[in-house]
Every structure is written in structure tokens, then in C-alpha cells.
Amino acid sequence: MKFFISFAFLCLVLSCVAALSPDQVESRLKSYVENRSFALLRSGRVARAGTNTVQCYDKYVPLIRQAAAEGKFASDKCAQEGQNAREEETKKSEVIRESLNVKVASIEKGLGACVAKYDVLEYFTCLRDHASESQTAAGEVGKTSAVIVEGLNIVLTNIELREKYCIDQAFEQAQEKSDILFTELENCLIEGLPEPEPEPEPEPEPEPEPEPEPEPEPEPEPEPEPEPEPEPEPEPEPEPEPEPEPEPEPEPEPEPEPEPEPEPEPEPEPEPEPEPEPEPEPEPEPEPEPEPEPEPEPEPEPEPEPQPEPESKPNSLFNF
């Protein structure tokens, strides 16, 4: 029974590996899985294992097949990337190829015209005329082709190296994963399946806090009514300009007072007896000057009245 189960396991693994591509990964994975499978079947420890081998195969065979499928997928991806890179480089060279085809066609056309000449002289004359042009065009075609060949060789070689490195990485990852799974399978066949660890009870999710009720939005305050625009005050009427006051008429100048006429001297009378000399009359006080009025001319001062001459004394009694 154990042998039958082991043989079925080997067939399943080999059938999975046989479908891998590209060829390098397929052959390398196939060789690796065969060696590990036969080594597992020849192990004495596995032959003395208990009755729980079916459970071990049920657990690890799908995992080994999955590892092989992942290696196949990775190798296919590497090969596809390499193919895409080669096609891209080929498309780049197509433009140069078309330009070279034009030059080659011109050479063929010229030489073909010479071949069609029946006359020998015309034939060689045509070859002579087209030889220089053909050599120049052929030289350009040869130089360009040499550069393209050298560049493509380098690019394609690099693409191939990258593809090989990618496939090697895919194989190594699949090999490492398969190696780990084979080791776990061997331990399972010898020691049995480990008891499953109790799954930790999921922590109760904290009850969501009640969302606070949204505060009511404050009612918008009513917009204040626009105040009525104040009526424009009437413009004050312009005050009438005051009439100019009439200029005061100039007061008439006072007429000058007439000067008093001098009194006539009295005729000498016969000298009487000498009488006592009369006392001289006091001189009349000068009249006060009137106060000057505004802007009138000053009045002339009155001349003082002449004083009466004293009566002369008679020199003698007989003065006629």
C-alpha cells in the first residue's frame, strides 16, 4: 500500500514537470524531482513510518505541484520577455534594411540593363559606365551592413544572456521551494502530522461608538432690511450779495470867519488936563480851536485882535 501511494506520488510529480517549458527548465526540474522522489522512496525511515502517510501525501503533493507550476510560469515569462526584446530589435533594423534595398535595387537595375544588351560593344560599354556607380553603392551597402551585423550580434547576445539568467533564477527558486517541501514531507512521513495549533480566538471587535448626533445647524439670521437712503438735503439758496453802502458825502468845509475890521483911530482931542492913565484892558482870550473833523482841511487860526494903542500923553499943554 505504501509503495503504491509512493509510486502514484512520483507519477503525479513527474507528469507536472514534464509539461514545463522552456526545455532547459523542464529537463533540470525533472531531473531534480526524480532524484528527490527516488531518494525519498528508498529511505528506510520512511519505510518504517506509521499509517499516516496518506495524510502527508494529501498535504504536500499539491504544494509540490504548485511549486513546479510556478517555476514553469516563471520560465515561460523569461522566454517571452527574451522573444519580445529580439522582435523589437528586429523592427529597429527594418528601417535600415529598406534603405539598403533601394540601393541594391538601383545596382541590379543598372547591371540588368547591361545584361540585356545584345551587342558585345554595347554590353561592355554599359558595364564600364555603371561599374563606378555600382561599386560606390555596393561599398555603402557593405559598410552599413557590417555595422548593423556587429550591433545586432551584441544586442542579441545580451538578450540571450538576460533570458538565460532569468530562467536560471526561476529554476533555483522552484528548486529551493521544492526542496523545502520534500523535507517537510519526509518529516511528516516519519513523525506524523503535527497537531494543529489551536486557532486564537478572534478578539471581539469593539463596539462602534455611537456617532454623536449632528448639532442642528443654526438658523440663518434674517438679513437686516436695508436702511432707506436719506433724501438729499436741498441745496441752500445762495445769499444775495449785500448792496454796497453809499459812500458818505464829504462834509462842506466851514467858511472862514471874516477877520474883524480894525477900529479907526480916534482923532486927537485937545489935551485936557492929564487924567490918570486908564488901566489897559485885558487882552481877549483866544477862542478855542474847534476839534478837527474827519478828513476836512484844518481851519486857519484866527488872527489875534490888535491891541488898542495907549493914548499918548501930551507933551505939553499946548499940543494941537
Swiss-Prot record:
The keyword Nuclease does not apply. It comes from the Eukaryota. It is found in: Secreted. One of its GO terms (cellular component) is extracellular region. Residues 194-308 have a biased composition (Acidic residues). Expressed in the gut, but not salivary glands, of female and male flies (at protein level). Present in vesicles in midgut cells and in the lumen of the gut. Residues 194-311 are annotated as: 59 X 2 AA tandem repeats of P-E. Residues 192-320 are annotated as: Disordered. The keyword Signal applies. Residues 1-19 form the signal peptide. This is Protein TsetseEP. It comes from Glossina morsitans morsitans (Savannah tsetse fly). The lineage of its organism: Eukaryota, Metazoa, Ecdysozoa, Arthropoda, Hexapoda.
